[in-house]
Amino acid sequence: MFYTCGPNEAMVVSGFCRSPPVMISGGSVFVFPCVQQIQRISLNTLTLNVKSDKVYTRHGVPVSVTGIAQMKIQGQNKQMLAAKCQMFLGKSESDIAHIALETLEGHQRAIIAHLTVEEIYKDRKKFSEQVFKVASSDLFNMGISVVSYTLKDVHDDQDYLHSLGKARTAQVQKDARIGEAKNKRDAVIREANAIQEKVSAQYMNEIEMAKAQRDYELKKAVYDIEVCTKKAESEMAYQLQVAKTKQQIEEEKMQVMVVERSQQIMLQEQEIARKEKELEAQVMKPADAERYRLEKLAEAERLQLIMEAEAEAESIKMRGEAEAYAVEARGRAEAEQMAKKAEAFQTYKEGAMVDMLMEKLPLIAEEISKPLSATNKVTMVSSGGSEIGAAKLTGEVLDIMTKLPETIEKLTGVSISQVARTG
């Protein structure tokens, strides 16, 4: 007789000529009645709800864990099929499921006892992998393959997990408040730093602008001084050149006038000569002619002297005017120089006054020594306790010179030695 089975079950034929028994998964077989026996075993996937109630963890906290496991007998694996037939042949699916469930539940309890609540709750994947690994080896020996295992639920009756959640929630809220406060603090600090940097940058910019303005004013003042100096020098040079030119023009005019006067004298002389010839040509007495000639010569000499005197006077006048203009230009230049010296004296005060005094000291010494230079004879009288001769005279002159700074200080209030030390 032929028997068939679907892919979700297997047939085991034993008896006459079937040693060892034949196992067929999803196929057909011929069985001799009365001498051979056929038995069926299910290959369906089993879904097990593995529940462990009040299992004590490593820290002694009782928890209840529920897992979902998928079991299956691999019909193509002859070794697993033979093992299952040896273990479960003749048993129903519920019996097989109960045995597998008890095995899984025992491994699940053992693994829970070695872990803490936090490890089970927070790392479910690790817990599932451990249960799957431990249970797979035992169930494989029974001919059952663990397809999958998933941790479904973890809870306890002591509100331990709830307390963990509260603590975690409080910690998260605390961290959130701390983070918010830190962010606000950092924002305020960054804003203050930004304001400080802005103000510092503004002040630095103003300082740089002030420095640039100061440098500009200083350079402009220097350039203005140079320009004014050059202008003054140019004006002085121009005025001197104008004075020289005017003087040259006046000299040329005087030379022209002298030449004109000379020409006039020559013309007069020629006229006198012509008249003399006329006299000679005329019939006159020699004496009268000689007298007339002498008179004319005297007249010509008189006119010549008058014209020469007038020319000399005009030349002297022109030269005087030119020299007066030159002296006037020089006076203006010296006045400008004195004005600049006055500005320098105003700026440097005592130093400038000392400088002026030092320039005039030689003149003062010269004036002091003038009486001595006019002395023809000096008679030295000594009482016997002091120097005599030239040494005494030199010493007295030196005493006079050394008293000059003291005299200047009394007259002007400026100490030459004090200014020299501070300068």
Curated annotation (Swiss-Prot):
Keyword Lipoprotein: no
Coiled-coil region: none
Description of what induces expression: By optic nerve injury.
Record bears the keyword Ubl conjugation: no
InterPro entries for this protein: Band_7, Band_7/SPFH_dom_sf, Flotillin_C, Flotillin_fam
Family that this chain belongs to: Belongs to the band 7/mec-2 family. Flotillin subfamily.
Full protein name: Flotillin-1
Source organism: Carassius auratus
Record gene name: flot1
